[in-house]
Design a protein with these regions (language model features):
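Membrane-proximal intracellular helices of multi-pass ion channels
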Residues: 1-294
């Protein structure tokens, strides 16, 4: 079952790589970029296709298997997700490319790049797209679109979702994943529009919104959000990161008008308190730097 599920996940990543392909087509990028992307897609389709030829009889997944599947998925997706950078020569080192994309999928936001302008628009988009996919969890995304996601896959989702407790918001696991991801994508789309209306170019709006959704912070320029010279954009991005930092189960409660369940959540209260206290302390610590600045 581990082999079968991981193979399906490789096929899903192959489909996801069609997104940067479409960006490369739009911006009429070099043939080297297309070769890099399609070579990676070909490898993923070959390996994934071979792995799903034989469907396992026992499709039960236990806790230990769930943890193993999650760990292997992160490693495999990061390795193959980094290959377009290696094949195109934009990040020649396999290790550096692996680090860059694992930072994206895990929404860490760390980077080996000192100059992001070396990346073409398609691969810069893919780099931030990994934030969007990883923000809710790679396996949550996969379970949301798999046609046969079952409640037996709950152990995978438990191992994937951060936090002390994972609870299904509806009876079926697939429906839970779909609801959470629809909420996630709806908020992402909202912030794309907000950033665009605030003055960002459309491409930048997508890239920054993906970095916001994953709370990892990948951007388009070396100087990040400061590049736009807009306090409004800075505030909007800060608000966006705070919004996406909330447990998405709670947003589902809001949809159901269960306001008490939302406001009474201990995790949410702790989150707000930590943000307010840390913001206050940092403000006090840096206040002297801005004295006399008009």
């Amino acid at each position: 079952m581990i082999r079968y599920l991981l193979s399906k996940l490789l096929l899903i990543e192959a489909v996801l790589l069609l997104v940067p392909v479409s960006v490369a087509i739009y911006y009429q990028e070099s043939s080297q970029v297309f070769i890099a992307l399609f070579s990676t897609i070909g490898i993923l389709v070959l390996l994934g296709g071979l792995g799903v030829l034989r469907k396992p009889k026992n499709q039960r997944i236990y806790a230990k298997e769930g943890v193993l599947i999650v760990a292997l998925c992160w490693i495999l997706w990061s390795f193959f997700g980094g290959l377009p950078f290696v094949f195109s020569g934009q990040i020649p080192s396999v290790i550096d490319a692996f680090f860059e994309i694992s930072s994206g999928f895990t929404t860490t936001g760390a980077t080996i790049l000192t100059d992001v302008s070396v990346l073409t628009r398609s691969l810069l988009f893919w780099r931030s797209f990994t934030h969007l996919i990883g923000g809710m969890g790679v396996l949550v995304f996969a379970l949301a679109i798999m046609d046969n996601a079952k409640n037996s896959h709950l152990e995978v989702m438990k191992a994937e979702v951060p936090g002390p407790v994972f609870g299904k918001v509806v009876s079926k696991l697939k429906n839970t994943a779909q609801i959470l991801y629809l909420l996630y994508l709806a908020l992402f789309s909202l912030f794309v529009v907000i950033y665009y209306l605030a003055g960002m170019p459309l491409y930048d709006s997508f890239v920054i919104a993906m970095g916001t959704a994953g709370t990892g912070g990948f951007t388009v320029y070396n100087d990040g959000i400061a590049h736009y010279g807009s306090s409004l954009i800075t505030y909007l991005v800060s608000i966006g990161v705070l919004v996406f930092g909330v447990n998405f189960n709670l947003y589902y409660y809001l949809m159901l008008r269960r306001v008490k369940a939302f406001l009474g959540d201990e995790e949410l209260r702790a989150y707000i308190i930590i943000v307010l206290v840390s913001t206050g302390l940092i403000t006090l610590n840096t206040l002297h730097l801005y004295q006399g600045v008009s």
